[in-house]
Amino acid sequence: MAHFAELDKNNVVLRVCVVDNKHVPSDKHVDGETWCTNFWGGTWKQTSYNNKSRGEFASTGWLWEPTKEKFYVAKPSGHDSWTLEETDSKLTWQPPVDWFNTEDCKLADNSDVKITINTWNESAQTWKGQHHKTEANGNLTITNFTWNKSTKVWDRD
């Protein structure tokens, strides 16, 4: 079985369909794309779970980049400063401040903390994080942090 993504005029994926291999005999994307166009109409591009030559497996709402011949997810809302970059043969949105390891983080006082929730703050151009801890009495304590891009440690808010 082969998978093909239908594209609109703006290269947005409308749907992904499965096509029997008997309709795509040569295992070349052009044959299958032509078959889909002849059968359903529209513009089609092959996508694959197994072969990542076209980036990630396409999903509805994703985009097709014709110059790179890759599918990629649309830019997340509220992430205007992020740029599309090709990494590990796929297209991904990258923040202007490097990602960090949330499992083994240092605070400004050099103590360790595990950040369990983190989000991008576009207006501050940095990461916001939270550490959740359940106390012995069952109460939940939430501590808020801001990533300090200069020192590369978490500052308590």
Identify the residue ranges that each predicted region occupies:
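Interaction-interface detector
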Residues: 1-157
